[in-house]
Each structure stands twice: as structure tokens, then as C-alpha cells.
Amino acid sequence: DVPVFAGCDRPMGRALVTAEHVHGETGLNGPDLPDPSMPLQDRHGVDYIIDTLRREPAGTITLCPLGPLTNIATAFEKAPDIIPRVQEIILMGGAYFAVGNITPAAEFNIYVDPQAADIVFKSGVPITVMPLDVTHQALVTRARNDAFRALGTPVGTAVAQMTDFFERFDKAKYGSEGAPLHDPCVTAYLIRPDLFSGRHINVEVETGSELTLGMTVADWWGVTDRPTNALFIGHVDADGFFDLLTDRLARL
């Protein structure tokens, strides 16, 4: 069993923004999931991050945030000694060519806590970014969703029901062939980085403008002399990604 720790319940410097209209009240609407059988751990999630990075050998821990970067930024602010101990951060967030999905300029995860994202991107830790540019290439089409359901397992059925729920919103909003699978791109990159390609560029987060708050300003073309601080992924082999995902779901 994997222990679960509750982290921060609000952004570092602004009111919380949520997205029930996309993923439902639970964030996982669609399947009829059982209630969790394992309670939350007593320790705060930020303290768990700090303690783990201090306990394990430096350069052996990769952080994989799939939401706002509040917990990591808070840990970095509380215990700056852990920053050089992080091997890498692989995150789902941001956008460049795909522009925003919560505002015209900003992707949701970064927009929720732009102050935290700014801290993380300026930390000096090696960062790999899975932006909307690449997650919108990983579309759950009807055929791909049928492949999940055809596994004939509780996991395959639950995933198919979940992506069915997302698909209705995403197809209506974007006019695409299916729903983008955002978060699994991070895990897929850990297993098969060869499925992805991108550029080492400078990425900074807008924190001062009301109009473009939370925008990931990505110097894709290298038009500034700002130092590179992130591998910004721009392409995924979508067929290879879904083959990998279906194979791994079949093992559960």
C-alpha cells in the first residue's frame, strides 16, 4: 500500500480556484469508485516531502506533481536545503502553442498557484514540463476508450468510464476527436521517455499581470538570452503512448 499524505488546501497567495465543471466534484467523476479503505497519514504532505528528501541519498528522488505546485514550493521555502537534493521535477502544467484552458493565456495547474510555480521554475532543479501542447496530442478516441473497456477488468472499465466523462466536456470545448489524457503523460515519460521530444528552453511564470496571470512564458525559439531551466515537451508518439497505457492497465 502506498501511504497518502494531505498537503496544502489553498494556494500560497490567492484564493483557491477549482474545476468541478471539468472533472466533477470528486475530480474523478465517471466510474462508481469505492470509498478509500486506507486513512490519510497524520503527517502533512509538505513535511513528508522534506523528510523524504533529507533521508534519501541526494539525487535519487524525482518529484512528479500532477496539479498546482503549492506543496513543492512550500517545501522549498520551508527547507531550502532540500532543493539541491532533488534529482528532477517532471510536472504536468503550462502551455505555449496550445495557449490556456482556464484563461486565454494560462493552463489550470499553473494558474491555480502562479506564485508557487514561479518558485519552482526559479529553483534551479532540473524540470521537465508536460504542457497542454503535448497532452492535447494524447487524445482518448472512441477506439482507444473501447480498448480500455475490452480489457474486461475492473480497472479497464473504471478508466473507460472516467474518460467517457471527460470526453463529453473536452469534445464540446475543443472540437477534438477525444479527451486529452494529461496526467498519464508524466508517468509514461518516466517509463518510456523515448516516446516524447522537446527542447531545453527558458520558462518563466507570469505573476503580476491580471490579464495573463499564470502564463508559462516559454522561450521556444530562443529569442532571449535567459538561461534554460526546463525541458519543454512538444511532441508525443500518441499511438506508442496508448499502447503503453493499455499494456500497463492490463497488468492491474
Show which residues each predicted segment covers.
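Conformational coupling and interaction surfaces
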Residues: Y111-Q115, M130-L252
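Active-site histidine-anchored catalytic micro-motif
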Residues: A15, T26, P31-Q137, R142
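Short glycine-rich loop/turn motifs that provide flexible caps or phosphate-binding loops at active sites
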Residues: A6, L66, M92-G93, T207, ...
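Generic secondary-structure signature for well-ordered alpha-helical cores
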Residues: D1, D9, R54-A58, E77-D81, ...
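Short hydrophobic/aromatic-rich motifs at helix boundaries and adjacent loops
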Residues: T18-H23, E88-I90, G156-A160
